[in-house]
């Protein structure tokens, strides 16, 4: 009988065998996997560095920088100027067009600024009194207590990297660099 069923009538892996038998899909999985790992790692590193720096009250012109981050998030530059910038940086049709532009997500930076701004300044000042540099404070004190933020950031970034099809559609013409999300969209 016809109809919609909650469970499959017959369990089979034939579709996966068919899919993984096609080189184009295997390559798309490899590109997506590498993009997700590299992009997530670099996004977490850059976001932590930038958002920690911008969250510090003693940063010279800090209010201006924070305003520019929020302003840039609300006012986008547009697709054509963005494409021209990527072309001038020679990122079109390269793997790095996936990773480099996504390293600094302004939403992630704003969330990070709020998180790092909530860390008590007495904790940071006591480390500086003991002779710790800014980098040592960040690595030895701030990062260990920031694991909830880092885990959330890594999860959001990984999902964003894996599901992104737009950049593969606009900035990549080479079939070998297409991602799974793009393949699922066009096929």
Predicted regions, residues:
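A hydrophobic, multi-pass inner-membrane permease signature
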Residues: 1-187
């Amino acid at each position: 009988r016809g109809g919609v069923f909650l469970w499959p009538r017959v369990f089979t892996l034939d579709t996966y065998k068919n899919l993984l038998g096609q080189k184009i899909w295997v390559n798309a999985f490899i590109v997506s996997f590498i993009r997700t790992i590299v992009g997530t790692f670099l996004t977490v590193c850059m976001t932590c560095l930038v958002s920690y720096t911008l969250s510090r009250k003693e940063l010279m012109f800090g209010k201006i920088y924070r305003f520019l981050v929020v302003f840039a998030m609300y006012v986008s530059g547009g697709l054509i100027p963005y494409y021209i910038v990527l072309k001038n940086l020679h990122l079109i049709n390269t793997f790095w067009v996936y990773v480099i532009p996504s390293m600094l997500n302004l939403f992630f930076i704003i969330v990070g600024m709020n998180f790092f701004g909530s860390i008590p300044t007495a904790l940071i000042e006591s480390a500086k009194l003991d002779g710790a540099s800014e980098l040592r404070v960040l690595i030895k004190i701030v990062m260990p207590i920031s694991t909830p933020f880092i885990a959330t950031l890594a999860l959001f970034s990984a999902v964003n990297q894996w599901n992104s099809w737009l950049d593969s559609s606009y900035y990549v013409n080479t079939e070998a660099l297409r991602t799974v999300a793009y393949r699922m969209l066009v096929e």
